[in-house]
């Protein structure tokens, strides 16, 4: 029953991706949207078909293989893979739970997002959980990498050593399939110190036969074969003899193999909807800043850092600046904020939000939360008719609401203004 449920959820995620992503339509790899609320398993069959298409495409490019190439391919196919998800959120206790952006939205969870409108429009893979991929037999050395596509996605690394029967692999970030220049790579010094030509060859788009928007996709069963064949294709084209010899070393170790693969590519693995497992490793890579903890709704880190009113001022300013209503309301309930506290917040020199903006501006800017605004005004923490002194000097909160066409805020301010006039 559990396996059937996983398969059904995966089918929904793939149906959404293949039917709604405009990129698949342009590549003639799309799938019609299901007629009912539930997706059939047809979308999983479609994934297998797409994977076979890309395997066939790369086989035609590299066939036949030399003995060195066959040996390298065999090493990759038999390698242990580890999957790394980085976040500033606290995603685990005894169980690791990682949810897709679509799942988070459906549950009205407020947290920092790494999925953007272009991703959703073009590939619609926002119902998947994303992982970097590492090749290593040495659990004690993990993680081997701390960034993905030059980006540090968080201070906590959550590592699993098991794949999903319904996952899919891309050789790069699925949306941004450009491999960056060597100077942006995490382990650049290894390649700059040891090789010459390949450091200039690595920056490129990784794509199929239909141009740079044609991003190869492999199901879990095919992913090692796809990685190996594409790596062989890159090695063949390289003019760097030293790099070629390094890759074809019969005794190459897993860490060196990982260095090669995550230099030539930036592997990304995707699991449908949600990962929930007790088989994982959590590694803290660095400290989490207060602002990052707030953006990630990491209450444990926030409570560790916000131990007095002075730090609460900082935290509240970060919450307002990042439109984190959940954290702002949490802090307001935990600490007894007064109008004097707000005045002290605005004088803080080490908080960019208070340096640039009045608190009233942050409360009423486009996308600000109505409940937070209501709390501040109803508890007398700010004056409804105060004119801004920093950004948009001379304007009021009503002006901000008018610019963003926030009818709920506009009505609230008008009622408050009317009440003020009646008392004069």
UniProtKB/Swiss-Prot annotation:
Protein origin, superkingdom: Bacteria
ANK repeats: 311-340, 355-386, 393-422
Binding residues annotated for NAD(+), in chain numbering: 85-87, 91, 104, 114, 130, 148, 153, 173, 268
Site feature Important for catalytic activity, where: 85, 130, 153, 173
Pfam families tied to this protein: Shigella_OspC
Annotated localization: Secreted; Host cytoplasm
Active-site residues annotated for this sequence: 268
GO molecular function: ADP-riboxanase activity; toxin activity
GO cellular component, one term: host cell cytoplasm
The entry's keywords: ANK repeat, Host cytoplasm, Lyase, NAD, Plasmid, Repeat, Secreted, Toxin, Virulence
Presence of keyword RNA-binding: no
EC code(s) of this entry: 4.3.99.-
InterPro entries per the UniProt record, alphabetical: OspC1-4
Catalyzed reactions: L-arginyl-[protein] + NAD(+) = ADP-riboxanated L-argininyl-[protein] + nicotinamide + NH4(+) + H(+)
Role of this protein: ADP-riboxanase effector that mediates arginine ADP-riboxanation of host caspase CASP4/CASP11, thereby inhibiting pyroptosis.
Family: Belongs to the OspC family.
Protein name per the record: Arginine ADP-riboxanase OspC4
Annotated gene: ospC4
């Amino acid at each position: 029953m559990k396996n059937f449920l996983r398969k059904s959820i995966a089918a929904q995620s793939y149906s959404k991706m293949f039917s709604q992503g405009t990129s698949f339509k342009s590549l003639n790899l799309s799938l019609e949207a299901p007629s009912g609320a539930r997706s059939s398993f047809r979308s999983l069959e479609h994934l297998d078909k797409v994977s076979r298409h890309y395997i066939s495409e790369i086989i035609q490019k590299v066939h036949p293989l030399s003995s060195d190439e066959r040996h390298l391919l065999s090493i990759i196919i038999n390698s242990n893979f580890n999957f790394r998800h980085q976040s500033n959120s606290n995603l685990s206790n005894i169980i690791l739970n990682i949810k897709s952006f679509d799942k988070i939205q459906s549950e009205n969870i407020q947290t920092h997002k790494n999925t953007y409108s272009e991703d959703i429009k073009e590939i619609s893979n926002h119902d998947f959980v994303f992982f970097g991929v590492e090749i290593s037999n040495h659990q004690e050395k993990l993680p081997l990498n701390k960034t993905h596509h030059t980006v540090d996605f968080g201070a906590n690394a959550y590592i699993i050593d098991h794949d999903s029967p319904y996952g899919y692999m891309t050789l790069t970030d699925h949306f941004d399939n450009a491999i960056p220049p060597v100077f942006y790579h995490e382990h650049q010094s290894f390649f700059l110190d040891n090789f010459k030509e390949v450091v200039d060859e690595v920056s490129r788009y990784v794509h199929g036969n239909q141009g740079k928007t044609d991003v190869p996709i492999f199901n879990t069963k095919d992913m090692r074969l796809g990685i190996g064949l594409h790596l062989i294709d890159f090695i063949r084209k390289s003019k760097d003899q030293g790099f070629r010899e390094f890759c074809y070393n019969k005794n190459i170790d897993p860490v060196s193999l990982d260095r090669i693969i995550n230099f030539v590519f930036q592997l990304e693995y995707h699991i449908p909807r949600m990962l929930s497992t007790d088989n994982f490793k959590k590694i803290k890579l660095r400290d989490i800043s207060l602002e990052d903890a707030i953006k990630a709704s990491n209450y444990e880190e926030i409570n560790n850092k916000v131990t007095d009113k002075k730090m609460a001022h900082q935290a509240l300013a970060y919450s307002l600046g990042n439109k984190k209503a959940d954290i702002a309301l949490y802090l307001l309930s935990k600490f007894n904020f007064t109008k004097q506290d707000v005045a002290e917040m605005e004088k803080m020199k080490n908080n960019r939000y208070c340096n640039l903006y009045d608190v009233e501006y942050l409360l009423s800017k486009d996308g600000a939360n109505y409940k937070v605004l209501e709390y501040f005004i109803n508890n007398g923490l700010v004056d409804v008719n105060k004119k801004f002194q920093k950004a948009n000097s001379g304007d009021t909160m009503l002006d901000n609401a008018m610019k963003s066409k926030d009818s709920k805020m506009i009505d609230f301010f008008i009622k408050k203004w009317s009440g003020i006039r009646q008392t004069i």
